[in-house]
């Protein structure tokens, strides 16, 4: 496959096309086309407003393998999938559209994303739709905020917030205390539609992370059966 990207001072556009393994045939796993566009109406040293729109389509071969969508706990504390559609064996194509937004003010960052997925099916069967998204916020307690990068140093990852930059004097290996960040997140995914009962999951979690790798978490989830649980 290949990807092409262009950018200006406050905007980016990226498009790509990918296929299967060349040894087994480019179309053996379907051919996918994706695109993403972003715009930052506010882009200052300490303040950024980011807006984005993305879409993709994958054409699936009629080989009987089908398609499945699933999700585990975001903290990966549990091995099993909390929601799972099982195999949709008559899937002929997948369309996705995503909306994204983020706002940074100094050490504070809030971001959100919503994705809607439609699965087309062979034989005139009804198209099924699934959706998911999240909202999260974080604040870095003793360091400046994450930098916003319009263009990548290499590759095609445009318009993203970089990781926390730890000053040399703050590194634990240099006798410092590290850098601390507190964050909270709510996310949800709905894999129920048109007779497919993949389940509905909602997660809430709060995390305190240090640059030294120490972390603590309190997590609440609402599983597909409506049960409530917590972990820490």
Can you describe what each PLM-predicted range is?
Residues 1-62:
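Aromatic- and glycine-enriched pocket-lining scaffold segments that form the walls
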